[in-house]
């Protein structure tokens, strides 16, 4: 615990088990949040290139995302821990403010007319998404008893997957099914991408609003003590100092998971930044942003992202089974290695003959290149890794944190999501230009190596809250179901 914190003397409230629909409602906002992230992650590099950015400059432009995360997430976590309104609760005001700002940003982004405007809007959009997203993690610890933590994080992972699938598919849906053009003159965003962002803005706001309206939060266990701590330690600069001081006072499990997170998110960020330039150049053999081939390739990147997010949602159902039979550490390692192999394999897919096509009938007749369909195979491994990244580290972490500092430490933990992204933003452009001679496909390979390394490091994490699961018994915490048995 960071210095200066008031230690609670009130007995911990015994939280009632929530019903399926209560967990559903409290997690539903993640559906909308992921629409925003899906559109951002799948299309900002495309927008940057359309506005004239060079491939090796894209990474530095993406610095907006991790920088805002570094500043916003721990501060929002800190102040949401110290917020209480009888009407609005603790986390819900942040959900609503972030949703309003993010939805407005999604409306503006596809109408930018210059590179600096696109970069600036990424700052605003990512900050807003972080404001509404960060307290959702803490809400699980606030409302759910320990034995339902995994169910809570699993529900969030499910909505993250579903939201990302539909959000990622919005541009190709408008292009393929609704026949909106995906090509525009130089320096302009295509109509199909504009409509995708407009749709995402509406869904983002409505989904988060649903959680705000349907979820009720518990007041602090000792309201007078809570008010005393708030008066003592509620200053803005105190909050910033406490947030960043949390890195020094992290529990052991949190420190170890931080290393795993670093290499995991370095890999993910390399994919989000360079998937569009890598696939359009290595698979579609073009860098002309006004060409149909480039925009078809950029649309297919969204399809790839939809597939890995769909796999993530399904994998979330199977991860507890694997963890029950083995351990959370082994499960996370296995998933990360699968994702790393998937990223590396994209390089080899580029050598499949590009002329072969196949016709599929799905809400109409469509012709695809075989290489496009094969490109979906690596997304299976990436989706499995993504599912684990979104749930297993948080399930491991929740048991190692004091309940009255849950939002605070969840915010601090996000440092190790944004720090590797900042490292990627500063270094990947240099590597792409000078090490890989501008071939961004090798940046994806580097990301795959980083993800495999993260998986291997997971085996050294102390997960004292995890237990071996035996068949049968009541639902328990620790990522599975069954009667706990002592681990040797």
Predicted regions and their residues:
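A late C-terminal transmembrane helix in Major Facilitator Superfamily
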Residues: 403-434
């Amino acid at each position: 615990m960071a210095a200066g914190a008031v230690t609670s003397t009130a007995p911990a409230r015994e939280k009632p088990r929530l019903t399926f629909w209560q967990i559903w409602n409290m997690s539903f906002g993640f559906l909308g949040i992921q629409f925003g992230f899906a559109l951002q992650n799948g299309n900002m590099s495309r927008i940057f290139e359309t506005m004239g950015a060079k491939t090796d400059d894209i990474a530095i432009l993406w610095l907006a995302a991790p920088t805002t995360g570094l500043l916003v997430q721990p501060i929002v976590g800190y102040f949401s821990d110290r917020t209480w309104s009888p009407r609005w609760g603790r986390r819900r005001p942040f959900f609503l403010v972030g949703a309003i700002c993010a939805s407005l940003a999604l409306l503006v982004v596809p109408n930018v007319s210059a590179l600096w405007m696109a970069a600036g809007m990424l700052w605003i959009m990512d900050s807003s998404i972080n404001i509404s997203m960060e307290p959702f993690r803490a809400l699980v610890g606030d409302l759910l008893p320990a034995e339902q933590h995994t169910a809570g994080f699993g529900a969030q992972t499910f909505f993250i997957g579903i939201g990302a699938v539909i959000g990622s598919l919005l541009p190709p849906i408008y292009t393929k099914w609704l026949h909106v053009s995906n090509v525009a003159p130089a320096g302009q965003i295509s109509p199909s991408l504009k409509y995708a962002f407009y749709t995402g803005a509406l869904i983002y706001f409505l989904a988060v609003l649903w959680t705000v309206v349907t979820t009720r939060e518990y007041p602090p266990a000792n309201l007078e003590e809570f008010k005393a701590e708030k008066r003592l330690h509620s200053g803005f600069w105190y909050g910033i100092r406490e947030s960043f001081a949390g890195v020094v006072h992290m529990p052991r499990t949190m420190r170890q998971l931080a290393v795993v997170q670093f290499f995991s998110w370095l890999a993910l960020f390399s994919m989000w930044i360079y998937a569009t330039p890598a696939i359009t150049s290595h698979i579609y053999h073009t860098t002309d942003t006004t060409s149909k081939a480039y925009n078809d390739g950029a649309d297919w990147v969204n399809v790839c992202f939809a597939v890995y997010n769909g796999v993530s949602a399904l994998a979330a159902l199977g991860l507890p089974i694997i963890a029950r039979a083995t351990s959370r550490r082994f499960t996370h390692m296995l998933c990360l290695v699968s994702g790393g192999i998937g990223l590396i394999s994209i390089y080899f897919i580029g050598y499949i003959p590009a002329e072969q096509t196949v016709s599929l009938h799905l809400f109409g007749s469509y012709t695809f290149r075989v290489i496009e369909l094969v490109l979906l195979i690596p997304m299976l491994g990436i989706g499995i890794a993504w599912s684990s990244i979104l749930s297993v580290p948080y399930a491991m972490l929740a048991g190692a944190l004091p309940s009255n500092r849950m939002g605070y430490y969840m915010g601090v933990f996000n440092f190790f999501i944004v720090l590797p992204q900042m490292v990627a933003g500063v270094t990947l452009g240099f590597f792409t230009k000078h090490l890989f001679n501008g071939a961004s496909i090798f940046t994806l390979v580097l990301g795959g190596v980083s993800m495999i390394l993260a998986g291997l490091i997971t085996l050294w994490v102390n997960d004292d809250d995890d237990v071996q699961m035996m068949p049968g018994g009541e639902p328990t915490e620790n990522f599975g179901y069954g009667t706990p048995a002592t681990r040797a």
